[in-house]
């Protein structure tokens, strides 16, 4: 079988949901708001394809730096490099 290099490769177990969590997320996850400077966790919701960050950022925590359209811009520290990630609110969870 040919080797494919899609954006969701190697995510068979990483993006898998629990049985009762399957299906579309609640509307409250779509309309959640964040403050600039707030810490958020990146938890990719595999049932929503729009605004999905890259799989390497799944499980990381970033700081909100602004909004771009319906998505939020975050800064992430990847080793010594500071990276900007753009993700929709369905894939973000506020840090408690």
UniProtKB/Swiss-Prot annotation:
InterPro entries: Ribosomal_eL21, Ribosomal_eL21_arc, Ribosomal_eL21_CS, Ribosomal_eL21_sf, Translation_prot_SH3-like_sf. GO terms for cellular component: ribonucleoprotein complex; ribosome. Keywords: Ribonucleoprotein, Ribosomal protein. The gene is rpl21e. Pfam families: Ribosomal_L21e. It comes from Methanoregula boonei (strain DSM 21154 / JCM 14090 / 6A8). PROSITE patterns: RIBOSOMAL_L21E. One of its GO terms (molecular function) is structural constituent of ribosome. Belongs to the eukaryotic ribosomal protein eL21 family. This is Large ribosomal subunit protein eL21. One of its GO terms (biological process) is translation.
